[in-house]
């Protein structure tokens, strides 16, 4: 039986592969089971896949201590890597955020990623809205086509 994680990761990879760029995908499972590196002709991206199986908007995501450690390990091992979170919102789509975008909505009083919660919502035919701690809203919306455009 195919797990939700396999199904949803597979959908994300299909969009990435069909984007048209020549890429290499490496599963860095030694760092974290949901961490991947994507190498294109222009950059190297580290991507943490996070999944919400909630059927409708809004989708919640919380970063664990293990994910925080994995992000730090990835950045220490690969100096020039760009980090992204691919927030898979069940079957709706993928809200792709850069590290800088994440930091704009994170609670600055908390450790870097550990315990940070964000909420992603989307109305029909619109972009994703991202809210962080204390209802801090990201200034700009995230277009549905940000995945995989941002990472390649």
PLM regions: where:
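Structural alpha-beta junctions
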Residues: 14-21, 78-81, 107-114
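A short, compositionally biased
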Residues: 30-33, 80-81, 123-124
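Exposed alpha-helical structural elements
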Residues: 8-12, 69-73, 101, 146
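Acidic-basic catalytic patches of nuclease active cores, encompassing PD-(D/E)XK
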Residues: 1-34, 38-43
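Catalytic cores of nucleic-acid endonucleases
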Residues: 53-94
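Non-catalytic C-terminal interaction segments of nucleic acid-processing enzymes
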Residues: 99-152
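Ordered hydrophobic segments in well-structured contexts
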Residues: 37, 45-50, 84-88, 93-101, ...
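Conserved catalytic cores of phosphodiester-cleaving nucleases, focusing on short active-site segments
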Residues: 29-65
